């Protein structure tokens, strides 16, 4: 696990975007795993500002709420269209179908699709309870794409996107931890003090279902990009491992 610590959240986003841009530009047919939520929004803005050519890129998203149609204003399908796809065309874009009549069958279909495509790089965020995608604490480390019930803390964290907590869906279809681990490369971005405890466990704890992101320690190609606040609880362990500041390796441009 390579950990890069930037001075600011914007710098962390720029570093992650630069990594993704380099990988996309270096391969003719590329499969990029995308995420939703607040973490990737700044990076998607950089995609648009640069008019990044993604015409050779196929995207697969991590998850989707169950019960929301693709046109629903709070669906992840709509999130991706509004924040990226409408301005940056991709070769193909795939998300789970949240309003599928049989969510279990849809999860199996999506698992098969992702496996057949083969993800070159997966972008991740991390929840305050250590979840990645919607793999909540207690999720089996070998889980495939599945239907999951969202914890109250996750629903509360996502409440800001809805009018009321009651409107936040209770279930989702999500790539499983094993599905995510099959990506050739993973870039995880975390910023802000609220993520510090989860980041500390991800880096310092042994792999455990109590903190799902700890499984990433077993992946050979993980880059974690943090700002100072997110790294604040693991500064000593990073120093002991000889990690350097990310700004020594990247030129940060406004």
Curated annotation (Swiss-Prot):
It is an enzyme of class 3 (hydrolase). Pathway: Amino-sugar metabolism; N-acetylneuraminate degradation; D-fructose 6-phosphate from N-acetylneuraminate: step 5/5. It catalyses: alpha-D-glucosamine 6-phosphate + H2O = beta-D-fructose 6-phosphate + NH4(+). One of its GO terms (biological process) is carbohydrate metabolic process. GO terms for cellular component: cytoplasm. One of its GO terms (molecular function) is identical protein binding. SUPFAM superfamilies: NagB/RpiA/CoA transferase-like. InterPro entries: Glc/Gal-6P_isomerase, Glucosamine6P_isomerase, Glucosamine6P_isomerase_CS, NagB/RpiA_transferase-like. It comes from the Bacteria. The active site is at residues 63, 129, 131, 136. Keywords: Carbohydrate metabolism, Hydrolase. NCBIfam families: nagB (TIGR00502). Belongs to the glucosamine/galactosamine-6-phosphate isomerase family. NagB subfamily. Catalyzes the reversible isomerization-deamination of glucosamine 6-phosphate (GlcN6P) to form fructose 6-phosphate (Fru6P) and ammonium ion. This is Glucosamine-6-phosphate deaminase. It comes from Exiguobacterium sp. (strain ATCC BAA-1283 / AT1b). The lineage of its organism: Bacteria, Bacillati, Bacillota, Bacilli, Bacillales.
């Amino acid at each position: 696990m390579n950990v890069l610590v930037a001075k600011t959240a914007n710098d962390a986003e720029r570093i992650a975007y630069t990594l993704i841009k380099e990988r996309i530009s270096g391969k003719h047919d590329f499969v990029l795993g995308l995420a939703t939520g607040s973490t990737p929004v700044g990076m998607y803005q950089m995609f648009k500002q640069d008019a990044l050519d993604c015409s050779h890129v196929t995207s697969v998203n991590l998850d989707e709420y169950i019960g929301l149609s693709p046109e629903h204003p709070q669906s992840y399908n709509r999130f991706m269209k509004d924040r990226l796809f409408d301005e940056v065309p991709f070769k193909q874009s795939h998300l789970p179908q949240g309003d599928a009549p049989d969510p279990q069958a849809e999860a199996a279909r999506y698992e098969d699709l992702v496996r057949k495509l083969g993800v070159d790089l997966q972008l991740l965020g991390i929840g305050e309870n250590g979840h990645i995608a919607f793999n909540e604490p207690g999720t089996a480390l070998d889980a495939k794409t599945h239907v999951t019930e969202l914890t109250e803390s996750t629903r509360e964290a996502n409440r800001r996107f809805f009018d009321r907590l009651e409107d936040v869906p209770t279930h989702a279809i999500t790539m499983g931890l094993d599905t995510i681990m099959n990506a050739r490369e993973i870039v995880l971005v975390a910023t802000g003090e609220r993520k510090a405890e989860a980041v500390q466990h991800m880096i310092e704890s042994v792999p455990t279902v109590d903190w799902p992101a700890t499984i990433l320690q077993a992946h050979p190609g993980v880059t974690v990009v943090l700002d100072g606040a997110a790294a604040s609880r693991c500064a000593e362990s990073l120093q002991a491992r000889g990690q350097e500041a990310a700004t020594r390796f990247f030129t940060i441009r406004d």
